Design a protein with these regions (language model features):
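Helix-to-loop junction immediately C-terminal to a conserved catalytic motif
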Residues: 55
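A short, surface-exposed alpha-helical micro-motif characterized by mixed small hydrophobic
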Residues: 211-213
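Conserved ABC ATPase signature
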Residues: 144-148, 152
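ABC ATPase NBD coupling module
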Residues: 16-18, 72-88, 106, 114, ...
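C-terminal boundary and immediately downstream tail of ABC-type ATPase nucleotide-binding domains
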Residues: 237-259
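Conserved ABC ATPase "signature" region
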Residues: 122-139, 248-249
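Conserved ABC transporter NBD signature motif
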Residues: 63-71, 228
């Protein structure tokens, strides 16, 4: 279980001496082992900052983060190394998060070598299994990221995350920039993958439509705070907060534009 209690994360305002703002303010969230949770909000709402705190990329300025009872928000490097693979972060810019000089085989082998100390033959076999899981052709191994399509790059990032055998995967705006057809293909693939592996997914998105399609629970975030939480929402009419209703209007406007 991944659990955050009263998380606050502050940043200094550029050009403002000794002036800080709360990117995340007193946020608590709990992710069980399995299921899909979504955090939805506009750009600047603090959701990506929260994702970085939950994945130990950044330490909170206040509050605590626990993974299976271990307070990872105060762990040193050695302790973090032991749990590093348990929470994986898949970023928005797939190509930017992949080493352009490595081929796919090297990208997938790295976590297998560092986290599990696998020998060469076992790494090779596991890479093939990961490609199959991500629905990538096996000859992809010899290619570099820049030679892959946008959809293939997304799937490669997912395969790399799976290589760590995580309990939780956080998708930070990972589906932005995909056209409607490709986006649905990726989302359907992830839903099937989550059901198969029973990994906990946290979907960070500005798109309430994506959150409704994917998630069992939705947290609406605004100005660093979670302002509304719905468990198993059935329709957009379940959202009550005025800001949440603005997000609903944005979805409906987008749908009309696509008709």
């Amino acid at each position: 279980m991944l659990k955050a209690e009263h998380i606050t994360k502050q940043y200094q305002i550029p050009g403002g001496r000794h002036t800080v703002f709360d990117a995340v303010s007193d946020v608590s969230i709990e992710l069980g082992n399995g299921g899909v949770t979504a955090i939805v909000g506009e750009s600047g709402s603090g959701k990506s900052t929260l994702a970085r705190v939950l994945s130990y990329v950044e330490r909170p300025d206040g509050g605590r983060v626990f993974l299976d009872g271990l307070e990872v928000s105060v762990c040193g490097r050695r302790e973090l190394r032991a749990v590093r693979g348990k929470v994986q972060l898949v970023m928005q810019n797939a190509l930017g998060s992949l080493d352009p000089h490595q081929n796919v085989a090297s990208i997938l082998e790295e976590p297998l070598r560092l986290l599990f100390h696998m020998g060469a033959e076992k790494r090779k076999q596991r890479c093939l299994e990961l490609l199959d899981m991500a629905r990538l052709e096996r000859d992809t191994l010899r290619h570099r990221p820049g030679e892959l399509s946008g959809g293939q790059q997304k799937r490669l990032c997912i395969a790399r995350a799976l290589a760590a055998q995580p309990q939780h995967i956080i998708f930070d705006e990972s589906f932005s920039g995909l056209d409607v057809t490709l986006k649905k293909q990726v989302l359907d693939f992830l839903k099937e993958l989550q059901t198969q592996l029973q990994i906990s997914f946290l979907v960070i998105t500005h798109d309430l439509d994506t959150a409704m399609y994917m998630a069992d629970a939705i947290h609406v975030m605004r100005r660093g705070k979670i302002i509304e939480t719905l468990e198993h929402p059935r329709s957009f009419s379940d959202f009550q907060e005025p800001y949440s209703q603005e997000l609903v209007k944005a979805v409906r406007s987008k749908r009309r534009a696509l008709q």
